[in-house]
Amino acid sequence: MKQDVRIAIDRGGTFTDVYYKISGWREQEGIFKLLSVNPKLYDDAPTEGIRRVLCYASGEEIPRKVPLDLTRVSSIRMGTTVATNALLERKGEKTAFIITEGFRNLVEIGNQARPDLFDLTVSRPSPLYQRVIEAKERVVLENQFSKTAGIVQGITGEFLRVEKKLDEEALYQDLKELYNEGFRSISVSLMHSYTYPLHEEVVEKIAKRIGFTDISLSSKLTPMVKIVPRAVSAIIDAYLSSTLRYYLDSFKKNFYNVKPNTIQFMKSDGGLVDIDNFTAISAIMSGPAAGTVGFAKTSSLHADDKTPAIGFDMGGTSTDVSRYDGKFEHIYEANIFGLYIQSPQLDIQTVAAGGGSRLFWRNQLFSVGPESAGAFPGPACYLNGGPLTVTDANVLLGRIIPDFFPKIFGPKENESMNKDIVIEKFSELRDIINIDIEKEKTIEEIAMGFIQVANETMCRPIRKLTESRGLDLSAHHLAVFGGAGGQHACAIASLLNIEKIIIHKYSSVLSAYGLALAHVTHEEQMPCLSVLDEDNLPLIQSKFDVLDKKAVSFLENEGYLESQISTELFANLRYEGNDTTMMIAKPKDSWDFKTLFEESYKNQFGFSLIDRKIMVEDIRIRAIARASNQSEVDTVFASETENENTVFIRDNKPTMYTPVYFAEVGKVNCHVYQLSSLPVHSLITGPAVIVDTTQTLLIEPSFTAKIFARHVLLEKTKSTLVVKKNVDLDPITMTIFANRFMSISEQMGQVLQKTAVSVNVKERLDYSCALFSPDGGLVANAPHVPAMLGSMQTAVKWQHNYWKGKLVPGDVLLSNHPIAGGVHLPDLTVVTPVFDNNKDIIFYCAARGHMVDVGGITPGSMPSNSKAIYEEGAAIKTFKVVKAGTFDEKGLTQLLFDEPAKYPDCSGSRTLRDNISDVKAMLSACHRGRSMVEKLVVEYGLDIVQRSMYGIQAAAEKAVRDVLKAFSVQNSQKPLKAIDYMDDGTPLQLEVKIDPETGDAVFDFEGTGPEVYGNWNAPIAITYSSVIYCLRSIINQDIPLNEGCLKPIEIRIPPSCFLNPSETAAVVGGNVLTSQRITDVILKAFSICAASQGCMNNLTFGYDGENGEEGFAMYETIAGGAGAGPTWNGTSGVHTHMTNTRITDPEVVERRAPVILRRFCLRENSGGKGEYHGGDGVIRHFEFRRSMHCSILSERRSRAPYGMNGGEDGAMGVNTWIDCSNPDFPRYVNLGGKNHVLMGKGDHIVIETPGGGGYGAVSI
């Protein structure tokens, strides 16, 4: 009988997993693991795995390091981390980047947001390229009626003008120089190449002629709008291509007699591709994608089971979670290792919590990760001097049994996993904790606490995948895999109220098994900017036909028969004026994308935009080739009735007994079973432990385990939702609640971003969501905009005091007035009370978002020249936007549109429709927060929830007191002093006096200048925000940011100074300018770092509505340079301190607004020199294509960002208007820091933002 060998291999960082199936005269199926790196025995782990399988198949020993005969092998499928590791370790090819002139630093600036709000060093991934060439070319968008010569139509149907043809000669010389310097890899991304790829294709021809071997064009890889992620994708592909190709070529050399399509690799999108077509950009998530395919194909109870499943893959350093509901969920833009890329990939959420995650006692709270012990030294029990980890906690609690692990630990890799060292280290930690909390905790209680915190941490991304989309978690199965997942499965399911857990027999190698079940795929994509309606449908269908033929032809050329190939059609749709796209699959029997899109949008966001056109952004074809000898799924039951009709075996004899610790019942002597010894249809009642050669399954009390042929099914035996009324208030409980409160805030933010319409909220992320105590004190917030986080507390407290005793369930409040805790008028705050049994307010949920326009004297409501608050738009102290459950749209319209227009020279909101939609989005976010709080109260009881809330605030208070006491000692108990001056000369003065015994501190702003006849007056809430931000940044630890941070602080602000202005004062600049200057002064007083750019560089442009049409407004805050510190250089081109909003992608700007972005790059040498230099500012240069109002609101234009400790000052910013009313003699006008101009068509504005100050004297 002819033999057929199929092999699937997942090469991970530590272990390589192998699944194989041998058919024919020697039938065999099996799995094994081997070390990914073991140079003493083999050069390449996958090749070694294949050699071992061939030994099994032939019954003969095959020597190592000789080519292997693959005659009997029909399939080798691999997932690999080669590209991932090269990216993480920065071991790719020397690469150059070609981009349109004026944008050389675009990728470095990115979206200008910093990864960690409170990291003053602003650590960002460094660029992957070594050189940049600016191609002399420019293509700009036009409308079809433009009379300008040279109009062409792009692939999307958009009209463009080739303003400047590519200078081929100059480019040739630049590329030739690169080639002579040893470059062989280039990436290319030119403006609007997603629709006009011709210039990129010319670059490719020139580069090939010179001899470059790796050329990645953004227009070919991901022809989608947004140049930044498209460019990053091209750069990654170019950077990794050579490394990946070297590995693939080396791998192929290990074999001979290889049939076509034998060796295939997993792509990030969950499809397989032949080794010769495997690309770097598709390889980044190869391993995790294989795991998702594995659980998707093995998590059905029976063939007709439609229950969606959550995949839970717990590894050593992190945990991956994903969802499958009968179809794979893809995303097309993602943040990978801090890099935003465009590439189809499975939607996999990762959290830095795994078996190797380290355990910490910090600020009287338990903390798990994100630091990891890694493969070496690994957990303490590995006997290589490692720290305590989640694995060690499981060992201590009896959930991992060392006797069932091989003796591969210790310096000589010949010892057993060691529990004694774990007991010793936990005992040391116990002594520290018990002293701090003044209670007696056992090492088991402490270890269990860390496990509970780890479990709660791992639940957060699962809730994000489901509850934030409005999906019911309890309606899912949990599919658990990965080496560490089995020890946490029951606890995770209980936390999520999931009743069934599915664990495949190959769960510890499910990524490898998933490869065996995957299909070969090929995708084709085409940009297609069309309105989705009956008139355009024939054109859209014809484009689909072109892609369909192309995709099918590709697979046929690979050797697949037409009968093996099927196709799936997708349209990437969005509402007009909205950048949120949804990839919608074509219905089987119709072309009704519209209905599916509207239903999907409403299901996910809670509403639809009835009056908006639906736009087709791009179309995509996914062609799937199914192998004839491959099974589709691997279900738990052979039939739908197997579980109900089966008599299960209950009297199984355990292998041994072992003590296991559980939170509910303490230590229990548990049965231990070996999975291989359990007959099919065995029933194991928890608590128990089931061990296998590659995994350990913990069956907790109230769970049972049913053994099937290829699965273990864990089932909850009683309701998961139990009111935990007897929970003690201890650090474990508080840490768990800190995670739950944070999760609520995060989900509120996700709902707000998804349901909002405006660019400000949805794209720039200019919003914040938070949870507040019954009296309005901050409890928890997601990491949104710092200027909002501390100030929202003031707003919620004002509303609480104003409405005390007068609110009823269903009431929701709206406010933006500075006197009521607002900061500036475009920031609307929605406050939702949460009631206990419709009686008492037990929490508040609040959301704040920056509206595009709320009226006033200029479009965008950010006037540079306002002198009174009414000029800045609608001012609302309090308003019941929802009264007893009824949304008052008429009242809201009156406040936003009618009232502001009553004042001289003022308009009502120019974007009323978007504003109302965004308010509804904030209502949706608060509704989500309220429902989650109510659920939490039902689960635990109100008493423990609120006591935990206050306990977490107390922990934050202690952390701040400890830091302040340390500063007092460091400064010899002297007051900390600083003074700085606004650009108009107004002083901003601070003295901080700290009590060295208690940590109490007075922040006294006596000496600060009076209210100004301008708009940079700062409502008092802004100072509170700045103080809380600085304290959290100085602490530099992951503590909860809440009201407790301000408990030790007394803030004294003189009456009538510009930090405490009158009710009618103009304040629009206080939030966006003065907040940054307050922050600089505080950090200066504490001698933390040099000044950052001290500004948000607020640029607004737009025009009023005419003839019944809405007006237009666009608002940006622009990055600058960060200040240097005692151990770090300042980062260039980044938002600092009190803001972290994103900047709109250049291509999106030019699509949406009648402007051309001429330059967006770093302002070289604008950072202050020093031992550590300040970061550079940026240059952002617009040309206006019609007359528009333009306002610039900025600081640091007359006073430079200071250096510290001998470091030099950063450069001041400059705002320049180029008046081109006479094109032959343009007029260059310095606008100063704050000004408003009516720009004519063809005029320009150039914003040069400040650099950061340097730190330390320059070495000579």
UniProtKB/Swiss-Prot annotation:
InterPro entries in the record: Hydant_A_N, Hydantoinase_A, Hydantoinase_B, Oxoprolinase-like
GO biological process, one term: glutathione metabolic process
GO molecular function, one term: 5-oxoprolinase (ATP-hydrolyzing) activity
GO cellular component: cytosol
Pfam families named in the record: Hydant_A_N, Hydantoinase_A, Hydantoinase_B
Stated family: Belongs to the oxoprolinase family.
Protein name: Uncharacterized protein C11D3.14c
Source species: Schizosaccharomyces pombe (strain 972 / ATCC 24843)
